[in-house]
Amino acid sequence: MTILTTLIKEDNHFQDLNQVFGQANTLVTGLSPSAKVTMIAEKYAQSNQQLLLITNNLYQADKLETDLLQFVDVEELYKYPVQDIMTEEFSTQSPQLMSERIRTLTALAQGKKGLFIVPLNGLKKWLTPVEMWQNHQMTLRVGEDIDVDQFLNKLVNMGYKRESVVSHIGEFSLRGGIIDIFPLIGEPIRIELFDTEIDSIRDFDVETQRSKDNIEEVDITTASDYIITEEVISHLKEELKTAYENTRPKIDKSVRNDLKETYESFKLFESTYFDHQILRRLVAFMYETPSTIIDYFQKDAIIAVDEFNRIKETEESLTVESDSFISNVIESGNGFIGQSFIKYDDFETLIEGYPVTYFSLFATTMPIKLNHIIKFSCKPVQQFYGQYDIMRSEFQRYVNQNYHIVVLVETETKVERMQAMLSEMHIPSITKLHRSMSSGQAVIIEGSLSEGFELPDMGLVVITERELFKSKQKKQRKRTKAISNAEKIKSYQDLNVGDYIVHVHHGVGRYLGVETLEVGQIHRDYIKLQYKGTDQLFVPVDQMDQVQKYVASEDKTPKLNKLGGSEWKKTKAKVQQSVEDIAEELIDLYKEREMAEGYQYGEDTAEQTTFELDFPYELTPDQAKSIDEIKDDMQKSRPMDRLLCGDVGYGKTEVAVRAAFKAVMEGKQVAFLVPTTILAQQHYETLIERMQDFPVEIQLMSRFRTPKEIKQTKEGLKTGFVDIVVGTHKLLSKDIQYKDLGLLIVDEEQRFGVRHKERIKTLKHNVDVLTLTATPIPRTLHMSMLGVRDLSVIETPPENRFPVQTYVLEQNMSFIKEALERELSRDGQVFYLYNKVQSIYEKREQLQMLMPDANIAVAHGQMTERDLEETMLSFINNEYDILVTTTIIETGVDVPNANTLIIEDADRFGLSQLYQLRGRVGRSSRIGYAYFLHPANKVLTETAEDRLQAIKEFTELGSGFKIAMRDLNIRGAGNLLGKQQHGFIDTVGFDLYSQMLEEAVNEKRGIKEPESEVPEVEVDLNLDAYLPTEYIANEQAKIEIYKKLRKTETFDQIIDIKDELIDRFNDYPVEVARLLDIVEIKVHALHSGITLIKDKGKIIDIHLSVKATENIDGEVLFKATQPLGRTMKVGVQNNAMTITLTKQNQWLDSLKFLVKCIEESMRISDEA
């Protein structure tokens, strides 16, 4: 974009503006948004000061930011995103917007140069005093000394929460001399101390908890946009007490108890940890002199104001909204007199003392003394939309008038295409920049702005893809580091105290934790389980593989088994029988698939390559991998049966479109089967748009087509004239004949009925099948894992997707009104989810009274199919602003313009449902907002809290596939293998059921469990060898380490575990060292055929297997063990060698030495 700024800065009109910009109050009129951005960016480039750009709302700030990213380095561009002050202060929310706010405040507090975009809401919001914010900026360096207590206190002040293990943003932990911190910005950090000196700083992976790279220094940013110190709390207590006493007599007696509860709920008087999320709503009482963001700017900052009159309008409505909101919360006993979130001073007063440059598209009167008025003449560019003749004549006019013509396109391929097109029109053009660009020619460069513009006085025109081809601007990739490492999903197998478990031999019990018991003066760790009545079972941690978490249907509370009874054996036998029947079916499926003969496609054609280059976006790595896997399948003779699992809007359709094109290029027909008429229409339009430049005949079969058109399509399929047909279950009718069907694409297969699924099954025999799904239902997920189907997963989001901002809050009409107004003010649409059909029309009336000017429609499952489709289509076509709907929108509706979702009674929904519903918004380059409301004063069930907590955690894009696993944890396995299996899964739990099924399938396939070369080794030594609670306090971490130790088979794995222990928990004590020694002995024993090592008090007994006895080289063994002298004796028992070792000082080392010698004499024997 350098060419554009070069042309502008050399122009006299800009130079006039540049002289007064930031020097005196100036009004600049006539510039379109993109032209204005170009001027502001050039002014910023030429100055050394901070530049503040104020907009009327966040939507406008987002739009200007997208254009500014073309000119300003991403590291120097900042935004202070405040969407809706009241909602943000009263709800639990996603961390992304807060991390952007913190990044901005931190840069300002450090005096960094930057271009800062701040919406009016952000300008007026109360903030922590600047000095306090500056005092809480921390940079840690290796070699420095820190006061640990003071440092941890500061972390708490900054909004961090102490946990035993860090797994979420905003947490820290202390284990010995190791401090872990997960900041809002950047990677999780591990600081290792040597006494008070920082010995090392490393970033680490929250999933594995392992360190990655060493770092010399790190900035620790706050985890909240408020700092709350003990002094702040002390001031807050006094102010709040006064506010409470002032408010109580002035409110209705009926809500005084509610006010008392509200007052006490802040727990200011007995808590040691203060919840920033709750206290932020008391910001007006926190600080003696709170700041606003203006106080953070340097005194010589340049200020630009975008559309003053719009800002004044927004300010008026913000004041009214704020007053009304505060009145509501006071009247309902949820707030106090004096509570506020914004500074009520006029906008002009806030920026008093700074020379301000006001930008306005039209000349306007303003209540401000202006020193200069600069008028630009700026015209919009003619919209060509691909019309060749109009384009040619307009370009010719620019050439004749000696204009500088700048053409912006988004990819290198398009630059080449555009030059070829202009060459055909005989328009001179260049694509490489020279020192000076001569007028009367076009320069085509990679770049994008939201719109083109013409500046006649400058002789400059900028033309974008929007004018050329009606393309929308691709949103520039921004910093993603702040959110890239956000929530990683923990295993759905994580055990918490109180969880139900299944012991393979004893049945369903309850997990009560890990307990260290002393038996015969030896300490060991055991897993404590509760069974029916008072029965308890202590399972040694080395047998923990026999214990699994119980996972089944969400509403199923399992019955505890009795220890020692026959009930569990009978249950398992029943399940075994049913599992064997299912295994039989699966094997038949598998055999059919292996033996079936399908069409074998060739390598990609030249047309395929051209078609793929046409895709305007860059593929994500997962998309590319999935495409390769699908093509590999198509190029085999066996028919493809692949499940493509990817989150909503992750580009599954593009993958399917490429497979369809490949099939068509080899003369095959493609059927694209979808569950709804509207989805059929949307996929049809996508295919038409993608394949418009290629000779591919695409038709649609749905109720939107006339009988005559349907008849023609059927005829075309029979004759081969139609290449691709998109449709609903009509495609499965018996009367449809294909000339040569090669590929069947099925979208959301689980939404089809049994009859349709059967028909799909018959088509699968010799046709390639690709199934698309956003949330894999466990059945499909599991079948894929069993190898009956292949699985491809798209987990990476497209570049321009931003996680949906998720708020969880109490139901409140003020919040709802603000959320609706915010979305409609940016010309967007809203899904309002209300899942009670009987009162849905009353809800519509209620919303209509709230929003009299909005067009509101209703959609629910009891409407006729035709009415429902017509309503949905009208909503998609932007004829309605708000759609009040039930969960029928859960899947398959794509409304890119609907970017706000409000769900009433969100606590009643299952997790995968909430996730799917949230996937309806945030599908364009705009940020999406989801508000999950739960009734005020309602105590949520633990499961509902779990669900809402999980959905808040998974604000990262792409948690869909993993959520299916988490969903098994919360919602249960559901109908995993059809209804008849449901009860069996509930009886034994999902994991044991799956294990039994897999074993049955393998047995019937003739696949034997890989038998170990040597039998299981039993090592029983009278030693304190365990993980003490003082070393690892967190039980889940403890279980995780025990599991790793149990699975250890090589010395490299032992070294890895030692490194992990030191990395995560610091140097280990003697009990842990012995535990590692025992594991090392076990590994030697595994490789040498030892079956038992038993401590018998004064001696250690060692038994070898018969096979090992035959293979051992006795001579080598005796020579190697000479240092042990008479402490070692050898004998034979049942044709197997036994060795006894007399215990003396350092006997554990002697045992390690002996076992190692046995292994070596075995290896030498093998080599001989």
Curated annotation (Swiss-Prot):
GO cellular component: cytoplasm
Residue numbers binding ATP: 646-653
Signal peptide limits: none
MF term (GO), any: hydrolase activity
Localisation per UniProt entry: Cytoplasm
Disulphides: none
Boundaries of every Helicase ATP-binding domain copy: 633-794
Alphabetically ordered keywords of this record: ATP-binding, Cytoplasm, DNA damage, DNA repair, DNA-binding, Helicase, Hydrolase, Nucleotide-binding
Primary site of residence: cytoplasm
Domain of life: Bacteria
Domain Helicase C-terminal: 808-969
SUPFAM superfamilies in UniProt: CarD-like, P-loop containing nucleoside triphosphate hydrolases, TRCF domain-like
Short motif DEEQ box, span: 747-750
Pfam families cross-referenced by the UniProt entry: CarD_TRCF_RID, DEAD, Helicase_C, MFD_D3, TRCF, UvrB_inter
SMART domains, per the entry: CarD_TRCF, DEXDc, HELICc, TRCF
UniProt record, GO biological process: regulation of DNA-templated transcription; transcription-coupled nucleotide-excision repair, DNA damage recognition
InterPro entries recorded: CarD-like/TRCF_RID, CarD-like/TRCF_RID_sf, DEAD/DEAH_box_helicase_dom, Helicase_ATP-bd, Helicase_C-like, Mfd, MFD_D3, P-loop_NTPase
EC numbers: 3.6.4.-
Leading EC class: hydrolase
NCBIfam families in UniProt: mfd
UniProt function note: Couples transcription and DNA repair by recognizing RNA polymerase (RNAP) stalled at DNA lesions. Mediates ATP-dependent release of RNAP and its truncated transcript from the DNA, and recruitment of nucleotide excision repair machinery to the damaged site.
Family according to the record: In the N-terminal section; belongs to the UvrB family. In the C-terminal section; belongs to the helicase family. RecG subfamily.
Record's protein name: Transcription-repair-coupling factor
Source organism of this protein record: Staphylococcus aureus (strain MRSA252)
UniProt lineage: Bacteria, Bacillati, Bacillota, Bacilli, Bacillales
